[in-house]
A protein has these predicted regions:
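Short catalytic helix/loop segments, enriched in acidic residues and glycine
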Residues: 20-38
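Extreme N-terminal starter segment of soluble prokaryotic enzymes
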Residues: 1-4
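Short acidic/histidine-rich motifs immediately flanking catalytic phosphotransfer sites
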Residues: 62-69
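Short acidic active-site motifs
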Residues: 54-58
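Flexible, gly/pro- and Lys/Arg-enriched active-site loops
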Residues: 76, 81-102
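A generic structural motif
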Residues: 39-45
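Short beta->alpha junction loops
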Residues: 45-53
């Protein structure tokens, strides 16, 4: 199974940006924990972009390349019609996560 993890804007700053709110765990720390949990059960790929268009393209390109997409769209969660449309249009199952529920 191949799982594509997509991370949206400013998640590259985890551990640095407002640690009193978001903590000191970095995106690399989270990626390492996910890899540890997956062990040999899944092929994991992580991508992060501050660009909405890149996230849309990665969702569109996931067909035939990933079995599932896991996305933390960050600030785009509440504002991006383009991401919503891309998720609705893809054949690949998409799971939306947030820092507050992982």
């Amino acid at each position: 199974m191949k799982i594509l993890f997509l991370n949206g804007p400013n998640l590259n700053l985890l551990g640095q940006r407002q640690p009193e709110i978001y903590g000191t765990t970095t995106l690399a720390d989270i990626e390492g924990a996910v890899r540890d949990q997956a062990e040999d059960r899944a092929d994991i790929e992580f991508r992060q972009s501050n660009d909405e268009g890149a996230l849309v393209t990665w969702i569109q390109d996931a067909v035939g390349q990933a079995d599932v997409v896991v996305i933390n769209a960050a600030g785009y969660t509440h504002t991006s019609v383009a991401l919503r449309d891309a998720i609705s249009a893809t054949e690949v199952p998409v799971v939306e996560i947030h820092l507050s529920n992982i």
